[in-house]
Amino acid sequence: VLALDVNSDPYHLALALVSPDGNLRRHLTLSLEEVDRAPNRGAKELLLWKIAHQVVSLAEEHGVAVATERLKHLPKGRRGDGSGRAFRRKQHRFAYASLLRKVHSLARKKGVQVVEVNPQDTSTIGMLKYAPQLSLSKDVAAAYVIGRRALGFKEKLPKGYQKLLGDGAFLVQAWDFYRARAEELRTQKRNERDRSRRNRLSRELKKAQGALSLLSSPLGSPGSQDGFTEGRKRPGANAWRVLRVGTFLPLLGREVPRDLSPLKV
């Protein structure tokens, strides 16, 4: 299959060609910066159709299906008005949704099969497992997971991660980090008078509280293609998410680290 994912910074489409045995055969990116700079909606639509043709032509060249996240998980139109990184990210998602619909439409017209999967945790799994293991960017790694999921593969935790989750000291260290972070954010929020900054602190506090809740829950299954695509849920915290909150910010210093090589095991 040829699997797709999008990245906001730099703004491009990541493609991963995945063989039937689940291995990564090839990967590449298509820049979407020109779409971002398009002077009007008509010009943007033409560029998106051009990229859709490139994607479908690549799938035809290799004789494979196209794998994407399910369209129902994507925004259906433009909303809001504003600027800044968060707004640009939202606009990029709207453009990505439009691009995927074009890819789906064009692929079906040309007789190329389209496989849709639930994208839940594909980015997290990609960043934790394949980005460090195969030296991939996080978006290519996410596309790879989408492709493997479309082929029916289940993502198992590497032994190093299994050992880490079984290490009580790791979980305690992560818990202490987020507890201290939550206390610091509460203090900053109490002393902050600017409304926009208070709102930002509230969002950060909510994330820290969510991490504490996740770290205090018993671990469930690390997840599988079946569980995600068919909607079945297993009890307990998702092990991939526990690893993400336990490693990214406490150990690597960022919620979405650019360099994931320290996680290579």
Predicted regions and their residues:
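Positively charged, helix-rich recognition surfaces that bind polyanionic ligands
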Residues: 1-265
